[in-house]
Amino acid sequence: MDTTPDNSEKKKTSSVREATFSINESFGGRLLTEEEDVFEQNAWDHVEWDDEHLALAKKCIEEQKLYPVTEKDAYMTHPERYWDQFYGKNEGKFFMNRRWIAQEFPELLDLLKEDAGEKSILEIGCGAGNTIWPILKENKNSNLKIFAVDYSEKAIDVVKQNPLYDAKFCSASVWDLAGSDLLRSIEEASIDAITLIFCFSALSPDQWQQAIENLYRLLKPGGLILFRDYGRLDLTQLRAKKNRILSENFYIRGDGTRVYYMTNEELVDVFGKNFKIIQNGVDKRLIVNRKKRVKMYRCWLQAKFQK
């Protein structure tokens, strides 16, 4: 549950850069070149963490390990129930629509063109539909089909009750990405693009392999997985309270939902065996509360994988 929307600043360029980025490469964004200017605006892109911040982060993680979750089984057996509770309480009010989706993943726009023909998008971990609605708003393709899935039954109810939900273009259903069964409503190797937006992190590492196999079976040859999720040492990881850590870099939030903080290297290990890596980027952003003079370091990973 990300309480700091990463689309809070209106920008015309992506804040993502490759993990192997060179300072000589050209890129857009808001760059902090002088430390004394840090409180001049609300956010800065591509801010590298200095030794002091990394030392504090390491200390924070070590302290968290002293107070692990005491009843792990409660969060590992039926994790979807915590998401049911979350969406039952918040419905569609918590998250903002991801208007940045086309900016970060322009490949989606090709599927939405009037003459694109039959195209299909699978949005996994759809939640309240905040990725779906901006896509439908941009769509000009009468032959587009969006399959929206989530393992929370309550989330699917929220999607279907939204006035923007149009059964002509969208089909929402309950499905567990890490389950052993594929979706009955989708043929194997039929999906043009799969969106994994702040979804994969909810899985336990021992579920990753099954999830990857399912993704591979659903995607067309040449199809894309569009991925964005929490990166290692993100602010939300460092702010985790006592008795929240399940295992290395795997936590529960205050509402019982789970989150794993990945690295670009892990993305290569997990996805690289089955897919061609088109992008493996990182979005390190410094969010500033100018009134309170507080600096908050955010880290998101963004990637594109092709079958």
UniProtKB/Swiss-Prot annotation:
GO BP annotation list: tRNA C3-cytosine methylation
Protein's UniProt keywords contain tRNA processing: yes
EC supergroup of this enzyme: transferase
Transcription regulation in keyword set: no
Catalytic activity: cytidine(32) in tRNA(Thr) + S-adenosyl-L-methionine = N(3)-methylcytidine(32) in tRNA(Thr) + S-adenosyl-L-homocysteine + H(+)
Keywords attached to this entry: Methyltransferase, S-adenosyl-L-methionine, Transferase, tRNA processing
Positions with a binding annotation for S-adenosyl-L-methionine: W83, Y87, G125, D150, D176, L177, I197
Gene ablation phenotype (knockout): Cells lacking trm140 show abolished N(3)-methylcytidine modification in tRNA(Thr). Cells lacking trm140 and trm141 show abolished N(3)-methylcytidine modification in tRNAs (tRNA(Ser) and tRNA(Thr)).
Membrane-traversing stretches: none
Protein origin, superkingdom: Eukaryota
EC number: 2.1.1.-
Described purpose of this protein according to its UniProt entry: S-adenosyl-L-methionine-dependent methyltransferase that mediates N(3)-methylcytidine modification of residue 32 of the tRNA anticodon loop of tRNA(Thr). Does not catalyze N(3)-methylcytidine modification of tRNA(Ser).
Family label: Belongs to the methyltransferase superfamily. METL family.
Protein name per its UniProtKB record: tRNA N(3)-methylcytidine methyltransferase trm140
Organism (species): Schizosaccharomyces pombe (strain 972 / ATCC 24843) (Fission yeast)
Gene designation: trm140
